[in-house]
Each structure stands twice: as C-alpha cells, then as structure tokens.
Amino acid sequence: MQLLTDFLHQETEIEKQQKKTGSFVPDFSEMKTQAPHLTNDLFFHNRDIYISKHNRYAPYPLHSHQFLELNYIYSGHCQQIINGQTYTLYQGDILLMDVGSKHQIECLEEEDIVINLLFKDNNISLQSLEEMQGNNSLLYHLLLSRHSHLEISQNFIILRSEEIPKVPQLLHRMIEEYFFQKDFSQEILKHSLSILLYELARSLPNAQKKILQ
C-alpha cells in the first residue's frame, strides 16, 4: 500500500511543468481544442481498462468522453464542475460519469490524488447489468441508457466513501495490478471490473439519490 502511495505521489513531467507555471499542460493533443471530446482511440490500445492519475497543480479544462469514466479520490479532495454545477469530492469518494458527461477539474494540490478508471462500454455485459438489483438500479439505468429509450435528467452518480466501504480496497488492488504489472494482471483487472460494478450497484441507495425523474 505504501509503495502505491509513494508511486502516485511522484511528480510526473507534466506536473513539474504545471507546478512551475500554474497553467494547464495538455496531456493529449486533443486537449488543445476548446471543450474537447476524448475518444476511445486515445486510451484503449490493446487493453480493456485504462487507469491514470490526474495531473496536479493546474485546473483541467472542460471536456467530455466517448466512454464511461470513474474518478476515485485516493487522497485529499477534489472540486469538479460537472454539467455546469460544482461538487466537492473527498478521500474515498467516487464519481461515475456516463458517455457525453462534461466536466472540468479545479487545481489539485500535492496531497490531492485523483485516479481515473476508464472502460469500454462493450466490456460490460448487458446480462450481468440486468442482474444488478433489477430495473430499479440507478447504475443499471446509467450504464444502459444508450441501449434503451430511457431519459435521464443527469448522467453521473456521486458515491460517498461511507456508502462504499469495500470499494477502496478493490480499487487499490486494481491500481496496483495496472501500474505494477505481473503475470495475469490483465485478466485480474478484467474480472475485478465486474466485481467493482457489482459492489457499486450494491451500494446505491434505492430512493435517496435518484437521478431519474
């Protein structure tokens, strides 16, 4: 665990530049355009899951995705503007965003470690999602909205740390497998993703955090 924490706190080259200037340094050429739309081709080269750390020390501009995105606050806190509204996330919180969600991230400081977990839509089994707490599952509606005629008022979910007590340990294992590759790491990541989705579905309250109107 300490090895992973030390690794994530190491400053990347982009972070070093942003720390000096306080200005955003694009990590992809597509980010140089206004409100860019990031596509699958940028991330999923012969892999099913993409995990990265958000670069600190400068705001990350407004952008949208062509894939499902999970933000995990590994340490510290994070302020994001999602679809025009500001939210603050703290250590252990998760933000799950559907395809087309637009968000920007305020400047992260030294102790603010935010992890991105991106996965292709076609890697999620429709059959397994149908079993996730039935049709009342908010996660089910969120992930399947493109495959049905459902209309949702928002296309993201925030889960607080107290609602997902078992998820951090699972995510830490996935992050370790991703950055410290060993035999069968890719297979472990694939299966861990399914378990992660079930844990998230289990944690979703039935009535308190409705996103469907």
Annotate each language-model stretch with its function.
Residues 46-140, 146-148, 182-186:
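N-terminal regulatory/effector-sensing and dimerization cores
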Residues 26, 36, 59-61, 154, ...:
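Proline-rich intrinsically disordered, low-complexity coils
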Residues 69, 166-170, 192, 196-199:
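Amphipathic, well-ordered alpha-helical segments in soluble domains
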Residues 2-19, 38-39, 108-176:
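A hydrophobic/aromatic-rich effector-binding and dimerization subdomain
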Residues 13, 32-33, 44-45, 51-54, ...:
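Short amphipathic alpha-helical segments, especially helix-boundary/capping motifs
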